[in-house]
């Protein structure tokens, strides 16, 4: 165990337009090379496109619902017992749940071929809202992996 004190959680201020801390964290994850204004433009225009596509009057609520649909509940962690390594299913902590969902959405939005980031992000959010697409598939694969290794659940630490 580390002898140092636990790292303090950095407080992220709410974003200026919607007043949401979650959205500001999402913007920070989209940001590359410290260019926050570009990340903000991308996220806000993607949110507008997304809200139009799903027919939501409140883009923030729709975004939070899409994020909720992408959050994993279980994941597997490697645990070495004797000479064998087991994939042990564990519940995902609330903060990590948010973080994983955001990372997956951004990863698959960037992977969309021939589209700008804002179009890809809007499309991926629509897919998450409708419970389909690459992000939801990743979540289901994670859950399936945890379900398949349920026999090793007693190795929790």
UniProtKB/Swiss-Prot annotation:
From which domain of life does this come? Bacteria
Q: Which CDD domains match?
A: uS7_Bacteria
Q: What keywords tag this UniProt record?
A: Ribonucleoprotein, Ribosomal protein, RNA-binding, rRNA-binding, tRNA-binding
SUPFAM superfamilies in the cross-refs: Ribosomal protein S7
What Pfam families does the annotation carry? Ribosomal_S7
Mind naming one GO cellular-component term on file for this protein?
Answer: small ribosomal subunit
Which InterPro entries does its entry note? Ribosomal_uS7, Ribosomal_uS7_bac/org-type, Ribosomal_uS7_CS, Ribosomal_uS7_dom, Ribosomal_uS7_dom_sf
Question: Per the UniProt entry, what are the Gene Ontology biological process annotations, in alphabetical order?
Answer: translation
Q: Which GO terms describe its molecular function?
A: rRNA binding; structural constituent of ribosome; tRNA binding
* NCBIfam families, A to Z: rpsG_bact (TIGR01029)
Q: Which family does it belong to?
A: Belongs to the universal ribosomal protein uS7 family.
Oligomeric state and interaction partners are given as: Part of the 30S ribosomal subunit. Contacts proteins S9 and S11.
Functionally, this protein is described as follows: One of the primary rRNA binding proteins, it binds directly to 16S rRNA where it nucleates assembly of the head domain of the 30S subunit. Is located at the subunit interface close to the decoding center, probably blocks exit of the E-site tRNA.
Name the chain's protein. Answer: Small ribosomal subunit protein uS7
Organism of this sequence? Chlamydia felis (strain Fe/C-56) (Chlamydophila felis)
Q: Which gene encodes it?
A: rpsG
């Amino acid at each position: 165990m580390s002898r140092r004190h636990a790292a303090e959680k950095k407080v992220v201020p709410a974003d200026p337009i919607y007043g949401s801390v979650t959205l500001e964290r999402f913007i920070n994850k989209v940001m590359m090379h410290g260019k926050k204004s570009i990340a903000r433009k991308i996220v806000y225009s993607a949110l507008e496109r997304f809200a139009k596509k799903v027919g939501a009057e409140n883009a923030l609520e729709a975004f939070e619902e899409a994020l909720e649909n992408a959050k994993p509940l279980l994941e597997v962690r490697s645990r070495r017992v004797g000479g064998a390594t087991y994939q042990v299913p564990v519940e995902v902590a609330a903060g990590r749940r948010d973080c994983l969902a955001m990372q997956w959405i951004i990863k698959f939005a960037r992977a969309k071929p021939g589209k700008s980031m804002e179009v890809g992000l809007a499309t991926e959010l629509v897919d998450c809202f409708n419970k389909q697409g690459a992000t939801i598939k990743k979540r289901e694969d994670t859950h399936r992996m945890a379900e398949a290794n349920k026999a090793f659940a007693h190795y929790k630490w």
